[in-house]
């Protein structure tokens, strides 16, 4: 969720892509991840990088030289890259436990929508999400009635106060 990564981008993360956790920065960059046949950078909060780093390099990790961050644990496939099917099955079981329906892409969508709602510039959101075109990013914009009313109230107050009076 915290990166807006596509499901396959997350599954393709290699351990060598993880930066060493750094206390001087709030955000880290995972360089040159595979994405839709291209390469892009993935931005992640430092707390997540610390968690991933600990997960991959924990002292009791069965396979300390694994190539991928997310690997299978079952004996026949232990240490191999986790497949989309296996990840999807884990997501399905999680849905059943929580009693709610959601999909991998919902996490990406929610992250992107949250950035937009917080007022992050759409050009930055575009880069963070790895969108080639701004119109793709704009598809994630879902304004609530509350958001629209708040902005129109501010706009109305400016008119009422005479800020735009000289224009007419």
Q: What is the role of each PLM region?
A:
Residues 3, 8, 12-51:
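Conserved tyrosine-mediated DNA breakage-rejoining catalytic core shared by Y-recombinases
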Residues 6, 40, 52-61, 108:
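Short, cationic motifs built from Arg/Lys/His that form the positively charged side of catalytic pockets
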Residues 7, 122, 134:
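Helix-turn-helix DNA-binding elements, focusing on the entry/boundary residues of the two helices
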Residues 11, 126, 138:
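The alpha-helix within a helix-turn-helix
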Residues 46-100:
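Active-site/catalytic core of tyrosine-dependent DNA strand-transfer enzymes
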Residues 88-127, 131:
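Short, basic (Lys/Arg/His-rich) helix/loop patches that form interaction surfaces
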Residues 129, 133-154:
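Catalytic-site neighborhood detector that most strongly recognizes the C-terminal catalytic loop/helix
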Residues 156-168:
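C-terminal secondary-structure termini that scaffold catalytic or DNA-interacting sites
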């Amino acid at each position: 969720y915290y990166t807006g990564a596509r499901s396959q981008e997350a599954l393709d993360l290699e351990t060598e892509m993880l930066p060493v956790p750094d206390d001087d920065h709030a955000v880290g960059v995972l360089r040159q991840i595979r994405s839709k046949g291209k390469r892009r950078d993935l931005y992640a909060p430092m707390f997540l990088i610390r968690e991933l780093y600990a997960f991959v390099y924990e002292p009791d990790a069965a396979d300390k030289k694994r190539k991928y961050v997310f690997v299978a644990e079952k004996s026949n496939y232990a240490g191999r890259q986790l497949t989309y099917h296996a990840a999807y099955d884990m997501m399905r079981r999680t849905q059943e436990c929580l009693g709610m329906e959601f999909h991998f892409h919902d996490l990406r969508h929610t992250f992107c929508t949250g950035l937009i709602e917080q007022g992050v510039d759409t050009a930055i959101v575009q880069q963070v999400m790895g969108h080639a075109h701004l119109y793709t990013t704009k598809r994630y914009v879902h304004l609530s009635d509350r958001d629209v009313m708040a902005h129109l109230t501010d706009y109305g107050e400016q008119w009422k106060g005479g800020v735009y009076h000289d224009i007419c």
